[in-house]
Design a protein with these regions (language model features):
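ATP-binding N-lobe of GHMP and related small-molecule kinases
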Residues: 1-111, 131, 135-140, 177, ...
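Short, well-ordered alpha-helical segments
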Residues: 78-85, 123, 238, 273
């Protein structure tokens, strides 16, 4: 049995640079990952099976996981389109060799939250099965498979700190300044990425330019062009940010991705934990964590 982390994804800034002829938005964004996330456990099995547990196991829709349990050998195939099992199917179709697996997904990341939960889960699956495989895929093949599963899956597969460009197909590693602790919070209201990107209130700030010399707060200050649209769709995001910004020891706060999760950076973990407690009292989901550093 092996267990792997699927870390939550944070967009420290996100700027919309325009749309291409296909209607895809081109972005400039800096992405990091946290020590908090979902967890996938793998055990050998005669047939593939998926069990979903955790706080948000029942909140998943057809875009990710739609049943608490999925087994290919049963007539209940409502989970056939979930991203974890699609990643496993895609791995085999690409030539990877892996025997049957019983997979347990502990779903800790809120759904529809702008934290990349489904993409992180798919990327964690690909990393794990490639390590277990008798005939692992080359990194380029694995990347192409990740890209076929969704725009955020390649960066979740790469991990670390990455500056992304275009529709997510351009990736450049970036050395993240010291950040201290990070607080994540969510109003417990799912927000559709499609609804945000098609809303008339998104901004088009363009490429941020050089990031040299910017500290963590300076990077966050480059902004999130999706925030105005998300605030219209889920006004509770504003209250979340206001509570964060009023807490002791905060360096900066912003919305992550397409929302509705927000994050804040703190020097001290104790301050982040105190802020999380305040948000929970106000009815928000919240957790204090650290930026995940790649060895």
């Amino acid at each position: 049995m092996i267990s792997v982390l699927a870390p939550a994804k944070i967009n420290l800034f996100l700027r919309v640079c325009g749309k291409d002829d296909r209607g895809y938005h081109h972005l400039d964004s800096l992405i990091v990952f946290t020590e908090f996330g979902d967890r996938l456990t793998f055990e050998p099995a005669a047939d593939d099976a998926l069990i979903v547990t955790g706080e948000f196991s029942t909140a998943l829709d057809s875009a990710e996981i739609v049943t608490p349990r999925f087994n290919r050998q049963t007539q209940d195939n409502r989970g056939a389109d979930n991203l974890v099992m699609r990643a496993l199917d895609g791995y085999r179709e690409a030539g990877g060799v892996i025997d049957g697996l019983a997979i347990t997904l502990e779903k800790n990341i809120p759904v529809g939250a702008g934290l990349g939960g489904g993409s992180a889960d798919a990327a964690a699956l690909l990393r794990a099965v490639n390590a277990l495989s008798r005939a692992p895929l080359d990194s380029s093949v694995l990347y192409d498979l990740a890209a076929s599963l969704g725009a955020d899956v390649p960066v979740c597969l790469a991990g670390g700190c990455q500056r992304i460009a275009g529709i997510g197909d351009g990736m450049t590693p970036f050395t993240m300044p010291q950040t201290g602790a990070i607080l994540l919070a969510n109003p417990r209201i799912p927000l559709s990425t499609r609804d945000v990107f098609t809303h008339s209130d998104i901004r088009y700030s363009g490429v941020a330019g050089s990031l040299d010399g910017l500290d963590a707060a300076g990077l966050v200050a480059l902004g999130n062009d999706l925030t105005p649209a998300a605030l219209v769709l889920v006004p509770q995001i504003r209250s979340c940010l206001e509570i964060m910004e009023a807490t002791s020891g905060i360096k900066c706060a912003a919305m992550s991705g397409s929302g509705g999760s927000c994050f804040a950076l703190f020097e001290q973990t104790s301050d982040a934990k105190a802020a999380a407690a305040q948000l929970e009292i106000a009815g928000y989901w919240a957790i204090a964590s650290q930026i995940y550093q790649v060895d």
